[in-house]
UniProtKB/Swiss-Prot annotation:
Pathway field: Alkaloid biosynthesis
Source taxonomy: Eukaryota, Viridiplantae, Streptophyta, Embryophyta, Tracheophyta
Record bears the keyword Lyase: no
Family matches, as SUPFAM superfamilies: S-adenosyl-L-methionine-dependent methyltransferases, Winged helix' DNA-binding domain
Gene Ontology molecular function terms on file: O-methyltransferase activity; protein dimerization activity
UniProt cross-references to PANTHER family, sorted A to Z: O-METHYLTRANSFERASE (PTHR11746)
Superkingdom: Eukaryota
Signal sequence, start to end: none
Subcellular location(s) per record: Cytoplasm, Cytosol
Disulphide bridges, residue numbers: none
Primary gene name: OMT2
Name the UniProt record assigns to this protein: 7'-O-demethylcephaeline 7'-O-methyltransferase IpeOMT2
EC number per UniProt: 2.1.1.395, 2.1.1.128, 2.1.1.-
GO biological process: isoquinoline alkaloid biosynthetic process; methylation
Family note: Belongs to the class I-like SAM-binding methyltransferase superfamily. Cation-independent O-methyltransferase family.
Length: 350
């Protein structure tokens, strides 16, 4: 094993640079959160063309004494790739377009959720959690589970639902175009944990003869209104799931332990007809091996797996781990359909 003394100066400098990049990367995200709170992406969009610094500063809700500091914030955000700068004017990059508040496909709420103090504090408590018997670092930080916290904080619940809805917009676009065949022949579908119905609305629109039901906790669907072939039903997936030809679980199971996943899947199995009548469960989840095969350069399932541990004491799963869950829940047939990088559509049959 090499030691610091045996390493060359060049190697040590590269190591120091690597650590500096990692340590200071949080500043990019804190600066991005600031930009969203100030409305910088939307200000540029509303302007209709690239904005110079004076125009941008005048459009922002800031104290006049802070105007001289905006150029330093923008320099950081340009380097991070969220904005472009040319001839002293700032514009949105393709990445920045995903930050617009009123665009149906956006990750603005997801960014604000991930940088919310409620989600940052458990990471600070991570080492403490390893030394105690709390279920999760989230419990160590807040004294309650993620779901208890969410149910007691309406504003946080709203942000969480908005973040999930933004994610669903992109997934729904892919589903109803490239994977339309998954829903063909179905007469009824229940979207379990479907929140405000973003995904189910897209499916209902693409398939007018398919009766779609969003099934979620009362606080998630209380203010939602059905329309045409879409309705909302309140309930708990651990108690029962409404009957349908197919049950949809979009990024639900990775939030739960193996034991709870089996409970959810068993309830789904009770609610669909047999394989000979076309009954199935449609799962959208990450599969660890697919990410390795894709060679994705971006932060992926290893990051998400850590977040699942920190928030829920759950995890991302391999094909082998998924297969065991399906078997334990009583499903005899399943197939993995690669969709987006490490994300898969998994079809289960009784």
């Amino acid at each position: 094993m090499e030691t610091v003394e045996s390493s060359s100066s060049a190697e040590l400098l590269r190591a120091q640079t690597h650590f500096s990049t990692q340590l200071f990367s949080f500043q990019n995200y804190a600066s991005l959160k600031c930009a969203l709170h100030l409305g910088i992406p939307d200000a540029i969009k509303q302007h209709g063309k690239p904005m110079n610094l004076s125009e941008l500063t005048s459009a922002l809700p800031i104290n006049p004494s802070k105007a001289p500091y905006i150029h330093r914030l923008m320099r950081m955000l340009v380097k991070a790739g969220y904005f472009a700068q040319e001839n002293e004017c700032f514009d949105l990059t393709p990445i920045g377009l995903l930050l617009l508040k009123d665009d149906p496909i956006n990750i603005r709420a997801l960014v604000l959720l991930e940088l919310h103090p409620a989600l940052l504090m458990p990471w600070i408590a991570l080492s403490e959690w390893f030394q105690n018997d709390d279920a999760t670092p989230f419990v160590t930080a807040h004294g309650k589970s993620f779901w208890d916290y969410t149910s007691r904080d309406p504003e946080f619940r709203k942000l969480f639902d908005e973040a999930m809805a933004g994610d669903s917009e992109l997934i729904s676009k892919v589903l109803v175009t490239e994977f339309k065949y998954v829903f063909e022949g179905l007469k009824s579908l229940v979207d379990v944990g479907g929140g405000n119905g973003t995904l189910a609305r897209s499916i209902a629109k693409a398939f007018p003869n398919l009766k779609c039901t969003v099934f979620d906790l009362p606080e998630a669907v209380a203010n939602e209104q059905g329309d045409g072939n879409l309705d909302f039903v309140a309930g708990d997936m651990f108690d029962r799931v409404p009957s349908a030809d197919a049950i949809l679980l979009k990024i639900i199971l990775h939030d739960w332990s193996d034991e709870n996943c089996v409970k959810i899947l068993k309830n789904c199995k009770k609610s669909i007809p047999g394989k000979d009548k076309g009954g199935k469960v449609i799962i959208i989840e990450g599969v660890v091996e697919l990410e390795k095969n894709a060679g994705n350069e971006y932060a992926g399932l290893e990051n998400l797996d850590m977040e699942m541990m920190v928030l829920y004491n759950s995890k991302e799963r391999t094909k082998k781990e998924w297969a065991k869950l399906f078997s334990d829940a009583g499903f005899s047939d399943y197939k993995f359909i690669p969709a987006l990088d490490s994300w898969c559509i998994i079809e289960l049959s009784p």
